Amino acid sequence: MRRIVVLALLLAGCAGSDDPQPPTPLQRELSELAETMELTHPELFHDVPRATFRAEGAKLANAAPELTRDELVVGVMRLAALPGARDGHTAVYPFDQHARGLHVYPLRLYDFADGLHVVGSLGAEGLTGRRVTAIGDRTIAEVVELVRPLVPHDNESGFRWLLPEYLTTAEVLRGLGIVAGDTATYSFADGTDAVLEPVDAGEVASTLGGAPAPLPTEHDPVWLRELATDQWLTTLEGGKVVYFGYRLTTGPTHDTAERLLALARKPGVRRVVFDVRLNHGGDNTTYGPLLDVLARPVVERKLVVLTGRSTFSAAGNFVAEVDRATSARFLGEPAGGAPSQWGDSIAIMLERAGLTVHVATAYWEFGPPGDKRQETPVDVRVEPTAADFFAGRDPVLARALALP
């Protein structure tokens, strides 16, 4: 759940006569942002020292009048991401609603096991399938490390989930000095280049999609079917495998849990596959009936859970609970959401900076008491390659079905 706060500046006060240069409205807004983050977040300094955060906040506010729009965006993103790991809800998201919308180069990227590839584009469809090797004069590895301090995350999986949005945001690339001017040159492993102009982020979000959206594909793998259904229950292998695609942790789950249990009890069922790879959260009070059913011996002994980088927020809580309550085997990538994490963010609207900053307001502890693990580990790590994706293969599900 997110709430909205608008930072209202009290501009009626006058600076003292000994202060010839009072703070500008933008400087006051940024100072108030840092103060509001301290007051709102239950443990802002879990990974970053208080002195470091305050120094960075003051540095940004002091420099603000001299910053370009791009540098300001980068500075606010950096400040928001300072809290560190297990804090992926505290952030400036490029595809969010901002008072002054951001701009992106019209590509959708994905970080496969064999590198960052184009999985979709607007106006340059021939780029799909190409591996990115550089942006401007920087190698992609250099660009990733320059962008890293801006990307909110619970863990490395979550970082890789959101990273592509920042790698295509024009204000980010210009503000970091990776590109100059409006256009950006993306270089690819086949020796080709593409010079791209930015478009409104909303245009890309509504077509290619941002990180939470399923990857665009012409194929029909099981895990990308029935995407409009948040709780999709079906069978595979002629009824021998029960497959449940849990896409959002929202809505009642009692009826679905009972149906899953009934299918698992049928003679000849050898496996229950519970797929949360596309589940980026919702409400962690809704999945109790599912958890109860997964702990039933008739389900538990057949249970395999598929997780991925976009398994986030309440879905990360769910995975941690399944891990504690059952002997399920976990396959895929570690969930992008930590077992215990800061969440329930509010949205702070910066009117003068033209940005929306999200700040966590609660700590959700679903791991053991005091658990600071960044991820729920997988028993078998399986990460698709670009070749797998573009051929329509799902090596994660294939491995789950092949387990003894």
Give the predicted meaning of each segment.
Residues P23-A34, V179, D190-G191, E218-P404:
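C-terminal "post-core" interaction segments
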Residues D18-R271, L278, R296, K302:
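Flexible, low-complexity junctional segments that flank or bridge functional domains
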Residues L11-G13:
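C-terminal motif of bacterial Sec signal peptides marking the signal peptidase cleavage site
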Residues L7-A8, G126:
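Intrinsically disordered, low-complexity segments enriched in polar/charged small residues
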Residues M1-L7:
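Sec-dependent signal peptide recognition
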Residues R2, G16-S17:
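Intrinsically disordered, low-complexity peptide-like regions
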